[in-house]
Structure formats: structure tokens, C-alpha cells
């Protein structure tokens, strides 16, 4: 037999990058929730979380497709649907550009 897919450095590095993007977004989400639960404004953190996680979902979906090769593009794999959903997620509750502009206005008086 051959090697397991995770034993290839390019694949394992891609998976590590996927994990880092997800965990970074998760920490932002937890901070926004903590601020809100503390009775403080989480307006900027919520916008940042939406942008970071939406972009992570797109990038992670693209990486998953690349890891799976042509199988990832087949509808049976559901990975192609994940990518379509991820791209659409950039438009729900404000586009990435609008939310980024909002954050820019909040951090640059």
C-alpha cells in the first residue's frame, strides 16, 4: 500500500492551515459572546467574526476540494455544495466589504 493522505506534507500543512483559520475565528466568536454577556458592545467584534469566519469557510472549502481532487467536485461528495454555501455566506448579514468598511471606521477615528 501507499501512504496515508495525511502523511503528505502539502496535505497535512493545508489541514493545519484550515485548523488555524477555524480556531482564530472561534476565538473571535468567543470574545464577541463574552463582551455581549458582560453587557458591553460587541458590534465591532461581531462584524470581525462574520468576516473572518466567512472567509475561513470559503478558503477551507477550497482547500478541502483541492485535497480531494476531482472527487471533491462530484455532487456526491457534498464538498462542492459546501463551497457554494461558503461563497453565499459572504453575502448574508452584510457583505464582507461592507463589514470590513465598518470595522475600518470603528478602528480609525
Model-derived regions: residue spans:
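Alpha-helical interface subdomain recognition
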Residues: 1-109
Amino acid at each position: 500500500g501507499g501512504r496515508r493522505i495525511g502523511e503528505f506534507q502539502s496535505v497535512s500543512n493545508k489541514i493545519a492551515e484550515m485548523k488555524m483559520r477555524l480556531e482564530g475565528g472561534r476565538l473571535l466568536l468567543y470574545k464577541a459572546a463574552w463582551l455581549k454577556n458582560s453587557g458591553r458592545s460587541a458590534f465591532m467584534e461581531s462584524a470581525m467574526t462574520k468576516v473572518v469566519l466567512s472567509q475561513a469557510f470559503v478558503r477551507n472549502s477550497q482547500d478541502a476540494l483541492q485535497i480531494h481532487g476531482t472527487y471533491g467536485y462530484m455532487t456526491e461528495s457534498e464538498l462542492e455544495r459546501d463551497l457554494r454555501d461558503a461563497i453565499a455566506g459572504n453575502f448574508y448579514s452584510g457583505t464582507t466589504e461592507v463589514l470590513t468598511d465598518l470595522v475600518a471606521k470603528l478602528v480609525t477615528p
